[in-house]
Swiss-Prot record:
Belongs to the nucleoporin interacting component (NIC) family. InterPro entries: Nucleoporin_int_Nup93/Nic96 (IPR007231). This is Nuclear pore complex protein Nup93. Plays a role in the nuclear pore complex (NPC) assembly and/or maintenance. May anchor nucleoporins, but not NUP153 and TPR, to the NPC. During renal development, regulates podocyte migration and proliferation through SMAD4 signaling. The modification Phosphoserine is found at S52, S66, S72, S75, S80, S430, S767. The keyword Acetylation does not apply. The keyword Flavoprotein does not apply. Coiled coil: none annotated. One of its GO terms (cellular component) is nuclear pore. GO terms for biological process: nuclear envelope organization; nuclear pore complex assembly; nucleocytoplasmic transport; poly(A)+ mRNA export from nucleus; positive regulation of SMAD protein signal transduction; protein import into nucleus. Keywords: Disease variant, Membrane, mRNA transport, Nuclear pore complex, Nucleus, Phosphoprotein, Protein transport, Translocation, Transport.
Length: 819
C-alpha cells in the first residue's frame, strides 16, 4: 500500500475519533494491547474461513471440471435433496379424511413390513452366527481333547518331568519322522499285516513286538516278557472283551499269570545275585531251587536275625527258607524244607500239603478257618516276620498287614497281596481276612496312585504294578503320556486289541482313559482310536505308508456316525500327505489303474477312493477330487467337477504354465480317453463339458487373432443367434444351459461383437478399386454384419440372465460405431 493510502486511512481514523469524542452520552471503552490483539485475531479467522471455503470450492471445480463434471449442477442437485421426506412422521388426519387415513395405513403397513423384515433378518443372522460359533467351538474342543493325553488332574499337570532316556535319540537319516525304535516297531506291524492280508495264519504280535526290545534296554525287554505272560490266557470265543475281562475264570487266570511272572522274575534275580557272589554264596549240592535259596540266604542273611523261630535247616532259618522257596514259585522245594523241620512246625505240614495240592492254591473253608484262628491267637504279634508272611499267604488272612519287614520291594508287595486275593464270596471271612481283586486294583490306582510310586524316576515300575493287576488300560494310558515311551504303549495296546483283551471307549469324544456308566467300578476304558491317531499324527505326513499300516487295525471300527474308521483315516491321511498316487494308485495313459499301497489291504478300492475324493471335494480341492473320481471310474463326478474348474478360465488368455493351460490339457486328456473308450456320463453334464471345451477353443482362436476361425466356431456352436429369425430359438435354448455356460455368456457376447466389429472395420478399410469383390457384395456384407450386431443386442436384452451394465454398454457402443 502506498503513502497516500496510509495517509487517507489515518485521516479517516482521526475523523472517526473526533466524532466519537463529540458524543458525550456514550461511555468511553479503553482497551489494552492484548484485547486489541484478540479482537484482531477473531476478525482475521473469520476472514480466513470465508477465504478457505472459497479456495476449496475453486479447487473442487478445477478437479471435477477436469473430469467433465459440472460442479454448479452437482451443487444444485445436492441442495435440492432432502432426507426429511424419507420417513416423515405420520400427520394426524380427521376421521372423515379417507384419503389421509388410507395413506397413513399404507405407510404404516410398509413401515411395519420393513421393520419386521429387518428384525427377522437380524435374528437369522444372529442365529447363523451363533450356530457357526458353536460348530467352531466344538471343533476347537475336539482338538483340545485330542491334545490332552491324560484324564482328570493329570491332564493339567505341567510339571517338568526329568525322566531318563529309554530309547536312542538318534533317528535314521532322511525325511522320516520315526526314530529307530519306532521304525523297528513299524517294520513288525508291516510283517503282521502282510500275513493277515494274505490270509496266512495269524502271527503272534507279542513275539514280533518283543523282538524290538533287543534294540532297547532291559526295562523294555522285561516289559514285553510281562505282557506276553499276562496275555497268555484262555478266553471264551465269540465273547466281547467286557464279558471276558469280568468273568471270574479270566480274572483268576490273570492273577495266576501275574504270580508266575513275579516268581520267575525273583528266581532270575536270585540266580544273578548268587552267581555274582559265588564265594559268599557257596553254591553246591543238587541243582535246584532249594540249593539256590540256601546260597541266596548266605548272601541275604549272613547272620541269624533276632526273633526267628522254630530252628534251622542246614544252618538257615526254617521260615526264611520256606518263604523264599515259595517266593521263587517252587512249592516242592518249600515242601522239602517243611518235611525236614516237621517236628517243629506242628499242624503246618498238613495245611501246607493241602495248600500245595489244591487247584487254586486254596485251603478248604474248614482248614482255612482253623489256620486263621491259630494265626490270630498265636502268630499275629509273632517276632518271626517270615513265619507270619507264610501263614498270611497260605491262609489268606490279615490282609491289612503289608509284611513290610519281608516284602520291602514293590514286586514283593505285589506278590504277597496277589497271593491273598480271593474270588469266592463265602460270607464267612471277616473284612480283615478278605481282599478281592477289585479292592486291590482300586487301592493301587486310586488310593496310592502315581505320586506313591515316583513315576518320573521309575515309570516302568508303575506300569508293571497296573499291568500285573490286570489294569491294562490304565497302564497303557499312563505309559502313553511319557513322550519317550509312547511307542511302547501304543504297541502294547495293539497287542491287547488284537487279543480281544482291550476295553475300548464307546465314543471317540471320550478321554484317553475313562470309566463308563454300567461298568464295574474297577474297570477303565481306553480310547483306542484316539490313541492310534495321536501316535500316527507325528509321522503321517512324512511316513504315510507306515501310518496306513497302523490305520488297518481300525478296519472294523466305526465312528459316531457309523462311518468306517479305516476309510476315514485313509482319506484324511491322503489329503494331509497329498500322496494320492502312492497310496491310492495312478491312472495310466491308456486308462488302466496302477495299484497303490491301499490295494494291499482291500481288493475293492473304489469305496475308499470315492471317500477320499468326496473329502477332497468338500475341502474345495476340486482338481484333486476330479482326478480321484477319475481313478474310481466315476465319470459323472469327474465331468461335474471339471465343469466347475473350466468355467472360470474359459475366457482367459492361454499362457504356458498357466492355470488355464493345465486345466485345458487335463480336460482334453479326459475327453480323448472317454471318447476312445466309449465312456459317457449324465447327458446334461456331458454336453456342458464338451461345450466348455469348444468355448476354450473359440477363445484361444479369438485371443490369437484368428477371428475368422473363431467366428466359424461360434457359428457352429449355435450358442448365440446371428440372425433375427433364430433369436427366439436361442433364447429358449439358453434356459437349458448350465450355470457354467451362463457365467461365460457376457464374455462370449463381447468376443462375438468384437469379431463382427473387426470384420466391419476390415470391410470398411477395403476400397472398391482394390477389392476383387463387386461393390454390391461389399454392401451386402456390410448390411449383414450390422444385422448380426443388432441381433446380438436383441439377444442380450431378451435372455433371462442379468449381464453386467458394462457388458451392455460396450455391446451398444460397438453396435453404434458400426452404424
Amino acid at each position: 500500500m502506498d503513502t497516500e493510502g496510509f495517509g487517507e486511512l489515518l485521516q479517516q481514523a482521526e475523523q472517526l475519533a473526533a466524532e466519537t469524542e463529540g458524543i458525550s452520552e456514550l461511555p468511553h471503552v479503553e482497551r489494552n494491547l492484548q484485547e486489541i490483539q484478540q479482537a484482531g485475531e477473531r476478525l482475521r479467522s473469520r476472514t480466513l474461513t470465508r477465504t478457505s471455503q472459497e479456495t476449496a470450492d475453486v479447487k473442487a471445480s478445477v478437479l471435477l471440471g477436469s473430469r467433465g463434471l459440472d460442479i454448479s449442477h452437482i451443487s444444485q442437485r445436492l441442495e435440492s435433496l432432502s432426507a426429511a421426506t424419507t420417513f416423515e412422521p405420520l400427520e394426524p388426519v380427521k376421521d372423515t379424511d379417507i384419503q389421509g387415513f388410507l395413506k397413513n395405513e399404507k405407510d404404516n403397513a410398509l413401515l411395519s413390513a420393513i421393520e419386521e423384515s429387518r428384525k427377522r433378518t437380524f435374528g437369522m443372522a444372529e442365529e447363523y452366527h451363533r450356530e457357526s460359533m458353536l460348530v467352531e467351538w466344538e471343533q476347537v474342543k475336539q482338538r483340545i481333547l485330542h491334545t490332552l493325553l491324560a484324564s482328570g488332574e493329570d491332564a493339567l499337570d505341567f510339571t517338568q518331568e526329568s525322566e531318563p532316556s529309554y530309547i536312542s535319540d538318534v533317528g535314521p537319516p532322511g525325511r522320516s519322522s520315526l526314530d529307530n525304535i519306532e521304525m523297528a516297531y513299524a517294520r513288525q506291524i508291516y510283517i503282521y499285516n502282510e500275513k493277515i492280508v494274505n490270509g496266512h495264519l495269524q502271527p503272534n504280535l507279542v513275539d514280533l513286538c518283543a523282538s524290538v526290545a533287543e534294540l532297547d534296554d532291559k526295562s523294555i525287554s522285561d516289559m514285553w516278557t510281562m505282557v506276553k505272560q499276562m496275555t497268555d490266557v484262555l478266553l471264551t470265543p465269540a465273547t466281547d472283551a467286557l464279558k471276558n475281562r469280568s468273568s471270574v475264570e479270566v480274572r483268576m487266570e490273570f492273577v495266576r499269570q501275574a504270580l508266575a511272572y513275579l516268581e520267575q522274575s525273583y528266581k532270575n534275580y536270585t540266580l544273578v545275585t548268587v552267581f555274582g557272589n559265588l564265594h559268599q554264596a557257596q553254591l553246591g549240592g543238587v541243582p535246584g531251587t532249594y540249593q539256590l535259596v540256601r546260597s541266596f540266604l548266605n548272601i541275604k542273611l549272613p547272620a541269624p536275625l533276632p526273633g526267628l523261630q522254630d530252628g534251622e535247616v542246614e544252618g538257615h532259618p526254617v521260615w526264611a527258607l520256606i518263604y523264599y522257596c515259595m517266593r521263587c514259585g517252587d512249592l516242592l522245594a518249600a515242601s522239602q524244607v517243611v518235611n525236614r523241620a516237621q517236628h517243629q512246625l506242628g499242624e503246618f505240614k498238613t495245611w501246607f500239603q493241602e495248600y500245595m495240592n489244591s487247584k487254586d492254591r486254596r485251603l478248604s473253608p474248614a482248614t482255612e478257618n482253623k489256620l486263621r484262628l491259630h494265626y490270630r491267637r498265636a502268630l499275629r504279634n509273632n517276632t518271626d516276620p517270615y513265619k507270619r508272611a507264610v501263614y498270611c499267604i497260605i491262609g489268606r488272612c490279615d490282609v491289612t498287614d503289608n509284611q513290610s519287614e519281608v516284602a520291602d520291594k514293590t514286586e514283593d508287595y505285589l506278590w504277597l497281596k496277589l497271593n491273598q486275593v480271593c474270588f469266592d464270596d463265602d460270607g464267612t471271612s471277616s473284612p480283615q481276612d478278605r481282599l478281592t481283586l477289585s479292592q486291590f486294583q482300586k487301592q493301587l490306582l486310586e488310593d496310592y496312585g502315581e505320586s506313591h510310586f515316583t513315576v518320573n524316576q521309575q515309570p516302568f515300575l508303575y506300569f508293571q504294578v497296573l499291568f500285573l493287576t490286570a489294569q491294562f488300560e490304565a497302564a497303557v494310558a499312563f505309559l502313553f503320556r511319557m513322550e519317550r515311551l509312547r511307542c511302547h504303549a501304543v504297541h502294547v495296546a495293539l497287542v491287547l486289541f488284537e487279543l480281544k483283551l482291550l476295553l475300548k471307549s464307546s465314543g471317540q469324544s471320550a478321554q484317553l482313559l475313562s470309566h463308563e456308566p454300567g461298568d464295574p467300578p474297577c474297570l477303565r476304558r481306553l480310547n483306542f482310536v484316539r490313541l492310534l491317531m495321536l501316535y500316527t499324527r507325528k509321522f503321517e505326513s512324512t511316513d504315510p505308508r507306515e501310518a496306513l499300516q497302523y490305520f488297518y487295525f481300525l478296519r472294523d471300527e466305526k465312528d459316531s456316525q457309523g462311518e468306517n474308521m479305516f476309510l476315514r483315516c485313509v482319506s484324511e491321511l491322503v489329503i494331509e500327505s497329498r500322496e494320492f498316487d502312492m497310496i491310492l494308485g495312478k491312472l495310466e495313459n491308456d486308462g488302466s489303474r496302477k495299484p497303490g499301497v491301499i490295494d494291499k489291504f482291500t481288493s475293492d478300492t473304489k469305496p475308499i477312493i470315492n471317500k477320499v475324493a468326496s473329502v477332497a471335494e468338500n475341502k474345495g480341492l476340486f482338481e484333486e477330487a476330479a482326478k480321484l473320481y477319475d481313478l474310481a471310474k466315476n465319470a459323472d463326478k469327474v465331468l461335474e467337477l471339471m465343469n466347475k474348474l473350466l468355467s472360470p478360465v474359459v475366457p482367459q488368455i492361454s499362457a504356458p504354465q498357466s492355470n488355464k493351460e493345465r486345466l485345458k490339457n487335463m480336460a482334453l486328456s479326459i475327453a480323448e480317453r472317454y471318447r476312445a473308450q466309449g465312456i459317457s456320463a449324465n447327458k446334461f453334464v456331458d454336453s456342458t463339458f464338451y461345450l466348455l471345451l469348444d468355448l476354450i477353443t473359440f477363445f484361444d482362436e479369438y485371443h490369437s487373432g484368428h477371428i475368422d476361425r473363431a467366428f466359424d466356431i461360434i457359428e457352429r456352436l449355435k450358442l448365440v443367434p446371428l440372425n433375427q429369425e433364430s433369436v427366439e430359438e436361442r433364447v429358449a435354448a439358453f434356459r437349458n444351459f448350465s450355470d457354467e455356460i451362463r457365467h461365460n455368456l457376457s464374455e462370449v457376447l463381447l468376443a462375438t461383437m468384437n469379431i463382427l466389429f473387426t470384420q466391419f472395420k476390415r470391410l470398411k478399410g477395403t476400397s472398391p478399386s482394390s477389392s476383387s469383390r463387386p461393390q454390391r457384395v461389399i454392401e451386402d456384407r456390410d448390411s449383414q454384419l450390422r444385422s448380426q450386431a443388432r441381433t446380438l443386442i436383441t439377444f442380450a436384452g431378451m435372455i433371462p440372465y442379468r449381464t453386467s451394465g458394462d457388458t451392455n454398454a460396450r455391446l451398444v457402443q460397438m453396435e453404434v460405431l458400426m452404424n
